[in-house]
From Swiss-Prot:
Belongs to the heat shock protein 70 family. GO terms for molecular function: ATP binding; ATP hydrolysis activity; ATP-dependent protein folding chaperone; unfolded protein binding. SUPFAM superfamilies: Actin-like ATPase domain, Heat shock protein 70kD (HSP70), C-terminal subdomain, Heat shock protein 70kD (HSP70), peptide-binding domain. GO terms for biological process: iron-sulfur cluster assembly. Chaperone involved in the maturation of iron-sulfur cluster-containing proteins. Has a low intrinsic ATPase activity which is markedly stimulated by HscB. The lineage of its organism: Bacteria, Pseudomonadati, Pseudomonadota, Gammaproteobacteria, Alteromonadales. This is Chaperone protein HscA homolog. The keyword 4Fe-4S does not apply. It holds the Pfam family HSP70. The keyword ATP-binding applies. Keywords: ATP-binding, Chaperone, Nucleotide-binding. InterPro entries: ATPase_NBD, Heat_shock_70_CS, HSP70_C_sf, HSP70_peptide-bd_sf, Hsp_70_fam, ISC_FeS_clus_asmbl_HscA. Gene3D superfamilies: 1.20.1270.10, 3.30.420.40, Actin, Chain A, domain 4, Substrate Binding Domain Of DNAk, Chain A, domain 1.
Amino acid sequence: MALLQIAEPGQSAAPHQHRLAVGIDLGTTNSLVAAVRSGVTATLPDENGQHSLPSIVRYTQDGIEVGQVAALSSAQDPKNTIVSVKRFMGRSLTDIQSGEQIFPYQFEASENGLPLFVTPQGQVNPVQVSAEILRPLVERAEKTLGGELQGVVITVPAYFDDAQRQGTKDAASLLGVKVLRLLNEPTAAAIAYGLDSKQEGVIAIYDLGGGTFDISILRLNRGVFEVLATGGDSALGGDDFDHLLQAHMQQVWQLTNLDPQLSRQLLIEARRVKEALTDASEVEASLTLADGTVLKQVVTKAEFDNLISALVKKTIASCRRTLRDAGVTADEVLETVMVGGSTRVPLVREQVEAFFGKAPLTSIDPDRVVAIGAAIQADILVGNKPESELLLLDVIPLSLGIETMGGLVEKVVSRNTTIPVARAQEFTTFKDGQTAMAFHVVQGERELVDDCRSLARFTLKGIPPLAAGAAHIRVTFQVDADGLLSVTAMEKSTGVQSSIQVKPSFGLSDTEIATMLKDSMKHAKEDISRRMLAEQQVEAARVLESLNAALAKDGDLLTSDERQQIDAVMAKLAEIARGDDADAIKQAIEVLDEHTQDFAAKRMDNSIRVAFKGQSIDNI
């Protein structure tokens, strides 16, 4: 006899029932969905047994095609077939059109300058296109697992900025899917390998996908993944290999002024040749022209290696920089994990092995390893595993800070700090009676604001009109597990506050990060000198501002000679402060301080007299 189970409406009668959650690798070229079932993590195939879904969306008069069916039509209808949409996420139309690559799409700009694809279905943005890629993956998962998903973990490149990460979340939101977490792709790979092998030590994650390259150096210790440093390039991947081979084949065949359809056909053939060269020393390429002419040529592995050599070397240079940032050497790296379909290219594996001095790990399909790691994390976050089994510590690639008087940067969260993180610092007002304060949030390693990257600006109003330096404003920087930054400023006595969530409209490539880091080291000595000068100039301005206010109020306490002497020293300080000698400014401030000691004493005496005027000794 079966037991009757009774539960309150809306509550589960089986509190320990397995909750449904999946990991989604939303890739530039292909996307996958994976889940943990009966303790085994695996990618989920569609009804045709295909695990990967081409990240391609075609818009027609009759509807929307996604995946393989869209890919088959891409050569005939390139204008309405959107590929590698991940590259457009969070980027402005100006940024896209200023690049070297020419796209077959018709673009229009949104109100905030972001790209809109003009299609037979109307204007669509990259977020909407991404949602169309997610849709069949979510439907596949729910059909396979037999129920509605309670959440997903979606992977993103480590160098996706806030706008790109938010766009990825928004794509899921359009489908009504709850995003448990955005997970960096290299970190997802570390989860997939780290839990299986239970190793400890330094691990390198070399992730070369269709459109992005990421290198992460992680330390694995007792189940804790700590990302020591990250690097890479958000605009370098297997797509670039395809375009180089496409250009080579076009040159050999002496083809000029290709229409979009023939150009897409040539790109598809270049991709086929690239993949075939993984296991062959040479491959015959062919292309059928509109008039029926069939062109053929043989592409050798040596030719292909020569074409892509510079790009592969660029990834190795990123590895070298990131190791230096992590404070470790290649010899200390125990294992190198290969992620992304482009790591199947023999030259890539050869160069990685030569650099790290050992053969990379490839036991998990490099196309599926990220999705598998995301699924493991989703299973934990949805509550199917104790979270103590795994702890993730990602890092902030560049310092975050606030502009202070004089154009200086006060760093609040240092570079390579693990996230999620919250840091707070107190600031104060510069002028008497100041009731508002403007905040400028910046990113970078330099000492002056002009040399850093501007992220956002906001204003805190309602500060009590107190004397300069009397108000206390607490500024809190909070970076969540998805790398999104929130900045809050609060005046402590009143509780009045203002905040902003930073969503930059432009992406941040690893080239920009590398340049900013190199510039900070190159100009370190100069920057310190400039900072010291700016600090002294700010101090001089503060002293003069304060003294002018004091003279306006109590100047009649001075004799004519005393006033002239102070005015002369103040004028001298103002003149010196306009120069570039920090020591001279500091000395001039000290001289002014000496000349105003008597004035300060007179003000104190006068304040005491006023305070006690009319009071008897007994009351005192």
